[in-house]
């Protein structure tokens, strides 16, 4: 009798809880429907595009090009460009990492602030892999080794061999300590035996180029866009490009890969990222739209005029690039014992 009564009590209790279960189920279904509606109607309000550097320059130009051309592909939504410079790009990037992952806050990331700075700067709070959702890599900005005419070497092998005759005699200038160009130089030193001395210039590429042309340093790692004009007119020597293929602006300058030196590929790049947790359907839609922009002949011409090489690709490909570069630069910083004060 007791057993039967107990079962009856359990059934009665279960029946009483049915309205609550039904309400919870309806709430879940309603939330799911709203989420699907949000994705289907995306975007239905302005999109913020954070640019972690000031107005002007190639990066800002890319942001404005993307905003103009993405708009008609995204329900004619307003895309607001917000320049947030400071701390080597960390201010704008940190803001993106803390933003709501709803597709309405994006970042024009560059390799320096996303995958290089976190390997060096302890105060940075974001993690390049955990805190962001890659959308699309947009462009490469190839970097290269360029030398003063006083350097006798005329190709990559001769350049490396010459550095070993008097280790440290060849100096290489870059735009500072701990950027992609500096780390590329350390990568060449550790993996190819390049025996040279780093000379950082906090004042930027123009001063580095001026001192190289004047013979105050005898080589440098610079962007192809900065070094290209003096190479073309014969005032400087193009030694090698760090990309996996030759630069469009300097097709006669070989890659290090062509010289049999693998594993040192490096370039600066720009790409779109969102906060981690952004719904994949939104990410895929943004990736498709971004790729359409950088495949457009007019957009390609404008980008190439800035010495930028469009790099259309998938979300997963960009994700793999971020992960591999963060791992690579972390190891280079450790091996070279690079410190940023």
Residue ranges and their predicted role:
Residues 1-44, 157, 340-341:
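Short, low-complexity disordered leader/linker segments with a strong preference
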Residues 2-6, 44-46, 194, 232, ...:
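An extracytoplasmic/periplasmic, membrane-proximal ligand-sensing/linker region
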Residues 35-130, 169, 193-221, 230, ...:
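N-terminal (or domain-start) structured segment
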Residues 98-105, 119-207, 256, 269-302:
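Hinge/capping helix and adjacent helix->loop/strand transition within the periplasmic-binding protein
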Residues 113-123, 182, 186-191, 219-253:
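A ligand-binding cleft/hinge motif common to bilobed small-molecule-binding domains
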Residues 154, 227-295, 324-327:
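C-terminal lobe and pocket-closing loops
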């Amino acid at each position: 009798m007791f057993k039967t009564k107990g079962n009856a009590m359990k059934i009665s209790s279960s029946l009483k809880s049915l309205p609550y279960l039904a309400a919870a189920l309806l709430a879940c279904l309603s939330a799911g429907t709203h989420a699907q509606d949000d994705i289907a109607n995306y975007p239905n309000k302005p999109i913020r595009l954070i640019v972690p550097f000031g107005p002007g320059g190639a990066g800002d130009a890319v942001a404005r090009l993307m905003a103009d051309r993405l708009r008609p592909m995204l329900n004619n939504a307003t895309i607001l460009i917000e320049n947030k410079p400071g701390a080597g790009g960390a201010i704008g990037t940190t803001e993106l990492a803390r933003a709501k992952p709803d597709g309405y806050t994006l970042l024009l990331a560059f390799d320096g602030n996303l995958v290089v700075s976190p390997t060096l700067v302890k105060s940075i709070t974001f993690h390049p892999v955990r805190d962001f959702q890659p959308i699309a890599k947009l462009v490469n900005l190839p970097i290269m080794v360029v030398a003063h005419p006083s350097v006798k070497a005329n190709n990559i092998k001769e350049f490396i061999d010459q550095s070993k005759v008097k280790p440290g005699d060849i100096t290489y200038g870059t735009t500072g300590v701990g950027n992609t160009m500096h780390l590329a130089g350390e990568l060449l030193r550790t993996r190819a035996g390049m025996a040279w001395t780093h000379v950082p210039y906090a004042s930027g590429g123009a001063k580095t180029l001026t001192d190289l042309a004047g013979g105050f340093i005898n080589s440098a790692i610079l962007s192809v866009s900065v070094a290209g004009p003096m190479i073309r007119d014969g005032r400087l020597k193009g030694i090698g490009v760090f990309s996996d293929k030759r630069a469009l602006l300097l097709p006669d300058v070989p890659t290090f890969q062509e010289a049999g030196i693998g594993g040192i590929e490096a370039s600066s790049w720009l790409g779109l990222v969102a906060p981690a947790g952004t719904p994949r359907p939104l990410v895929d839609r943004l990736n498709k739209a971004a790729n359409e922009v950088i495949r457009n002949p007019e957009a390609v011409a404008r980008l190439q005029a800035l010495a930028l090489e469009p790099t259309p690709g998938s979300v997963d490909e960009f994700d793999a690039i971020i992960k591999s570069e963060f791992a690579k630069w972390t190891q280079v910083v450790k091996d070279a014992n690079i410190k940023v004060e």
